[in-house]
Amino acid sequence: YVEVIGGRAVVPSAGPPCFLDRDLFGNNMITGDELSIFPDQTEFIKRMEVLGNGAAVMNIPGTAIEISPTEVRVMHPVADDKVREPFDNKAAYLQQYQADWAQWLADYKDTWPKDHTDLIATLQAWWGPLLAMAPMLRAAVGGGCVMNTDGLSIYIDFAGGVVVPFNGQPHKYKFTIARPLLEAVVASKAVDWSNSLFLSCRFSAWREGEYNEYLYNFFK
């Protein structure tokens, strides 16, 4: 896209996330050797340079970019020599970030529902009509999906277009999600589960075969 458009400036601006949960902290890419899909701005810029494009613009929260017909002006909220500090000392930066937000994160998780609701009935009422409208997507998913949570296993029957209890039915996909988080996502009627749940990495998953874009699209 950059080559086709011929952009004078390329701004990496979609991440990376910061995983501050203690059990997810290892998902942060710190040394570059981690099994992570979340590189930072500096890695993006290096990749651009390897490809022969020096138009990438370094940015951090608060960076302002002014674009005119003759120039691209970048103004950072800190001195230029401080811009790379979070990246050059990433472990210490993230550990401090985690400590600063620990109480807020604990308070936020405490807002998740503690009571159990009838998730199967709620999801069937919500998703049943959507599944009925999407026969081609259901066929493309190609199998059932199990959602395991505390005290409950839910089966999304894409072939039949219903949400029912899981009782050993054949399936190609499985998610395990903590009940309070799942209850919160369902209660809010989250339209895009990728942003509301999956990008947080607060779940585990299993699949048979290749990644299926259609299943992901259903949750979006």
Where are these regions (language model features)?
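Feature captures hydrophobic
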Residues: 58, 63-220
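Acidic carboxylate-rich catalytic motifs and surrounding loops in phosphoryl-/glycosyl-chemistry enzymes
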Residues: 13-17, 54-65
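Cap/insert and terminal regions of metallo-dependent hydrolase folds
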Residues: 1-52
